[in-house]
Amino acid sequence: MFMRLKVLEMNSIRRQTLLRQFTNVYNVVSRSARLCSQAIPKRLFYSTGSRANSIPDALSRLRNIGISAHIDSGKTTFTERVLFYTGRIKDIHEVRGKDNVGAKMDSMELEREKGITIQSAATYCNWKRKQKDGDEQDYIINIIDTPGHIDFTIEVERALRVLDGAVLILCAVSGVQSQTITVDRQMRRYNVPRITFINKMDRMGANPWRAIEQLNAKLRIAAAAVQIPIGSEDNLEGVVDLIHMQSIYNRGKKGEKVEITGSIPEHLKELANEKRALLIETLANIDEEIGELYVMEETPSPEQLMSAIRSATLSRQFTPVFMGSALANIGVQPLLDAVCDYLPNPSDVTNTALDVNQGEKSVTLHTDYNEPLVALAFKLEDGRFGQLTYMRVYQGVLKRGNQITNVNSGKRIKVPRLVLLHSDEMEDVEEAPAGSICAMFGVDCASGDTFTDGSIKYVMSSMYVPEPVVSLSIKPKNKDSPNFSKALARFQREDPTFRVHIDKESNETIISGMGELHLEIYLERLAREYRTECITGKPRVAFRETITTKAPFSYLHKKQSGGAGQYAKVEGYIEYMEPKEDGNGRLVDHEFVNHVVGGAIPSQYIPACEKAFKECLERGFLTGHPIKNCRLVLEDGAAHSVDSSELAFRVALTHAFRQAFMAAKPIVLEPIMNVTVTAPVDDQGVVIGNLDKRKATIVNTDIGEEEFTLQAEVPLNSMFSYSSDIRSSTQGKGEFTMEFLKYLPAPGYVQKELIAEYEKQHK
């Protein structure tokens, strides 16, 4: 059995449809079970195909997918069509529509006002995939629509962490853009196969072949078209299916009627044959069966092509490319068919966890209803009924009312309420089995926590969380505002890239995030959701300090003032280290190494030394910014049988580290951003001149017919107010994205200014 949903409110037709889909097999078997008065073996719930007795039939028809792309490529518009064509919503509303309703997946008021996706949103829908024999097969598609702006990249990270496949959307005019490359990197990090949809084929300057070339060259993944457009720009009518060599048109007022004809327009036959041959040639380099047919100069059948595309897509060696225009209601239904045909079901994906009881040994999880529960909390939201925790169930079944264990905290909790999500709407369910995406209410946990039924102690690896690069001091206009701290605590809990701390010296509240827009959104949410207006300081750059050479240390801390004294001696050295990955794939930029032998420093004091080292890294001695890329090696020392203590060794190591740090030729590092600018060709000189003033290094320039795209490396310290500059210099037609790239030594004059300012504050 795959899923048995007991929907608490059976008013709506779609709930009844979903219930029928998941319980058809169950009801038959349950009736038999009652007649026989005995338990039914679980194997009766499984399909009798090639993978009989291994996966439920319904599980093979489940897809968990994400919609990802560069900003303004049409992700949310595409998702709106998917929901409409699958019957999930009754009408289409545009992202910036005149009716002011907004797209279903943009549920936040801010999202609808700004016309951008800020938070990922989850939903599910049913799609009837027509089979070769004319029958229809029902598929369940769980969808997460993600933001395209780099400032909200954590939403993409946590979505891809739990999804099985993805639809990568490209703009037919702009092709592969900066955030496309970022999303590709995230997909590779979590081994997510993808199919590609070239959107906006109705726009002037649309060039799908250029976009496919960029997929091959910039993303370094084999890509080939499985469709070609019928018409272009304003005359776009439909697509030619290169696998079956047939034409597909969207008819009806909103493209809801799909018309398939066996003929191809005469003027497109040559192009169709050319692109089909290229598709076969590309697959021949990946798939053995197609390769043999290619060598024998035999033509593969549509079934062989589809099998090869699925195999190559699942192995992440290939991405099939589809075309259309979501806004013009063209090409969306064929892509839904492709989601069913080429993207994996949960059992096609290998997921692993770490067995805590076996020294964190890697174990493979099984997408099986009967196995012990393993589920991951991947996102938190504060809702009207308490904390809403988004869950991906990898193994077993999550049931309302059952007791489950948070492996990370050790707490045993009861599942009070379980829901399926449709953007900001929810539908109660009794249970969610392996492969499901659902949400729990009223469970206190952190993002990344693993839950089991208590019989096993597995933890799943956490998602990658980038470090914030911009900070801002804030304070409420009304000092008595009770919601200020409450709001910041909530935002931190929901968003791992949003950080809050109190500056120890100025006592100011400092918020940190991924960019100016990221922080602006939270300030607006403070004002709207908590009615707390804030006064902000000047944006701060996340400078860092590091050392450039090795320096030894030897320090004796000795204090006697009556009673028990303090005694501790530490010796060793500090040195520069390159960042390295830990076991979870996260970069570590500091290291404490204990080389003390013979008990010169008793073992109970070593943790105090390590703690002091980490505390020193939090605030550097040049400018007060954190220290990175530093290794401390503790080699020797001395202790007193009476006067030594943890405090004494913490004090000794703190003084020793400061002396060694100042002797190791420390410098200040500044964050360098990868900036991509797209603007009209006529404004190229103005844009380059503006970036030159900001000390940019131009890395690449791609000039199109009407627009050019420029990639540059720019110090973050020089990028403030750039958004208003580019708007004014390009008459509002230019846009840019910015992503953290690396740290480099700051220019000498910048270092001197920062050091002088810090010394002035600490006189």
UniProtKB/Swiss-Prot annotation:
Single GO BP term: mitochondrial translational elongation
Cellular component GO terms held in the UniProt record: mitochondrion
Residues that, per the record, bind GTP: 69-76, 145-149, 199-202
Annotated pathway: Protein biosynthesis; polypeptide chain elongation
GO molecular function: GTP binding; GTPase activity; translation elongation factor activity
Domain tr-type G: 60-347
InterPro entries: EFG_II (IPR041095), EFG_III (IPR009022), EFG_III/V (IPR035647), EFG_IV (IPR047872), EFG_V (IPR035649), EFG_V-like (IPR000640), EFTu-like_2 (IPR004161), G_TR_CS (IPR031157)
Record keywords: Elongation factor, GTP-binding, Mitochondrion, Nucleotide-binding, Protein biosynthesis, Transit peptide
Keyword GTP-binding recorded: yes
Transit peptide residues according to the UniProt entry: 1-52
Main location: mitochondrion
Superkingdom, natural source: Eukaryota
Localization in the cell: Mitochondrion
Similarity-based family: Belongs to the TRAFAC class translation factor GTPase superfamily. Classic translation factor GTPase family. EF-G/EF-2 subfamily.
HAMAP family: EF_G_EF_2_B (MF_00054_B)
Function: Mitochondrial GTPase that catalyzes the GTP-dependent ribosomal translocation step during translation elongation. During this step, the ribosome changes from the pre-translocational (PRE) to the post-translocational (POST) state as the newly formed A-site-bound peptidyl-tRNA and P-site-bound deacylated tRNA move to the P and E sites, respectively. Catalyzes the coordinated movement of the two tRNA molecules, the mRNA and conformational changes in the ribosome.
Name by which UniProt lists this protein: Elongation factor G, mitochondrial
Organism: Schizosaccharomyces japonicus (strain yFS275 / FY16936) (Fission yeast)
Lineage, highest ranks first: Eukaryota, Fungi, Dikarya, Ascomycota, Taphrinomycotina
